[in-house]
C-alpha cells in the first residue's frame, strides 16, 4: 500500500482456528491486517539482498515518516518518528499510525537502508559493497568510518542498474570483486564502485 506492506490480507473476521488471536483486534489494526512498521525494515533488506533496488527504496519511502508530511492529517503522528503500526486498508482509518516510540522500527529500517540499499555489509575480515538502488541513481557518495579508517565511497551507475558490481577500485587499485579486505585499508581511502 502507499503506507507500507500489510501484515496479512484479508483480516480475520472470526476465530479461524484455536490460537488465531488476531481477531481480538479490529480489522486492519495490529496483527489483524495492519501495517507493522518494524517488519518494513526487514522487507527493505530482503528486497535489497535480492537485487531489487527499486522495490527496496519504494518500501522505504512508503513507511518513512518524513515522506508522509503531505498526509499528516491522516497519519496523526509526529513527522520524525515511526509508529508501531499503521492501520491497513481494511480499516476505516487507513493510513493512521499508532503507538509512537514503542517500536524497534528505526533500527530495522537503518539496517535495511545501510546494509541493503547502500549495500555496506561488514564481516570479520572486511567490507562488502553491494548496493541495491533505484535505476535513476546515477551517482551517490558515502562517507564511512570503518574500524577507525575513513572511506570516501563513490558509486557510479552509468548503465542505470539496480544492483551488481562491474568494478571496485580502492585507492587506485582494482579489486577482484566487490569485497574490501580490512588489511588493504589505509587511514584515508578513496573507493569507487561501478554498478
Predicted regions and their residues:
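Extended glycan-interaction surfaces of carbohydrate-active proteins
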Residues: 1-37, 68-93, 118
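Carbohydrate-active enzyme catalytic cores, enriched for enzymes
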Residues: 1-3, 29-32, 40, 50, ...
Amino acid at each position: 500500500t502507499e503506507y507500507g506492506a500489510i501484515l496479512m490480507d484479508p483480516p480475520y473476521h472470526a476465530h479461524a482456528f484455536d490460537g488465531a488471536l488476531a481477531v481480538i483486534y479490529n480489522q486492519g489494526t495490529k496483527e489483524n491486517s495492519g501495517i507493522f512498521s518494524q517488519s518494513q525494515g526487514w522487507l527493505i533488506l530482503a528486497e535489497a539482498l535480492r537485487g531489487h533496488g527499486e522495490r527496496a527504496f519504494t518500501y522505504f519511502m512508503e513507511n518513512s515518516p518524513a515522506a508522509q508530511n503531505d498526509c499528516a492529517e491522516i497519519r496523526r503522528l509526529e513527522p520524525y518518528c515511526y509508529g508501531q503500526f499503521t492501520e491497513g486498508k481494511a480499516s476505516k482509518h487507513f493510513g493512521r499510525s499508532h503507538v509512537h516510540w514503542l517500536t524497534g522500527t528505526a533500527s530495522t529500517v537503518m539496517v535495511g537502508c545501510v546494509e541493503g540499499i547502500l549495500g555496506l555489509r561488514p564481516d570479520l575480515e572486511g567490507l562488502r559493497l553491494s548496493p541495491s538502488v533505484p535505476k535513476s541513481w546515477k551517482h551517490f557518495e558515502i562517507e564511512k568510518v570503518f574500524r577507525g579508517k575513513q572511506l570516501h565511497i563513490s558509486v557510479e551507475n552509468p548503465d542505470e542498474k539496480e544492483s551488481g558490481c562491474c568494478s571496485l577500485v580502492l585507492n587506485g587499485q582494482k579489486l577482484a570483486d566487490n569485497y574490501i579486505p580490512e588489511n588493504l585499508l589505509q587511514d584515508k581511502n578513496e573507493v569507487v564502485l561501478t554498478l
